[in-house]
Amino acid sequence: MTNSKLIYIEDDQILGNLITQALVDYGFEIDFRTTLNGLQESLASMLPDLLILDIEVNNQSCLDILPAIRSQYPQLPIIIASSHTNGAKIVRSYDAGANHYIKKPYDVTELVFQIQNLLQQSEKQLPAIWKIGTYQVDTAKHLLIYPDERILSSTYKC
């Protein structure tokens, strides 16, 4: 599981730095952010293996944008890490598209376990065809399908 790319969003800079360093020590590549601004662009450019979100980030709720993220990246594992322990908030997180909810404070080893578990599950469910914007990538046949349905074939594996 090492070298997996994660986007981690936490508005508490100190906590975020501590968790980021711990995850780096476990071998993960982390894009740590303290704001939801630019998240969609980062998802598109980085294509992370997993996303970790705090529910409330600088007076913004990630639950408002989570359905759009889930719609655009249906296979992306998403963990919500929050101090909210209210059952309704937890259920709303799952309804919005989260794969797992971890309550703060948490032990980093618990977070790492959940990350590894979700990454293993997502590897088993990889689709043969990925949709990236208006393009499609067929990983089984090594094809890039353009919006006008032109096909670029690859003779080597990426």
Residue map of PLM features:
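Conserved acidic segment of CheY-like receiver
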Residues: 2-14, 19-23, 51
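Short amphipathic alpha-helix used as the core "switch/output" element in two-component signaling
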Residues: 63-75
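C-terminal output helix
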Residues: 86-88, 106-115
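Active-site beta3 strand of CheY-like receiver
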Residues: 46-57
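A structural micro-motif at secondary-structure boundaries
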Residues: 131-132, 136-158
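Short hydrophobic/Thr-rich beta-strand motif most characteristic of the beta2 strand and flanking loop
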Residues: 26-36, 42
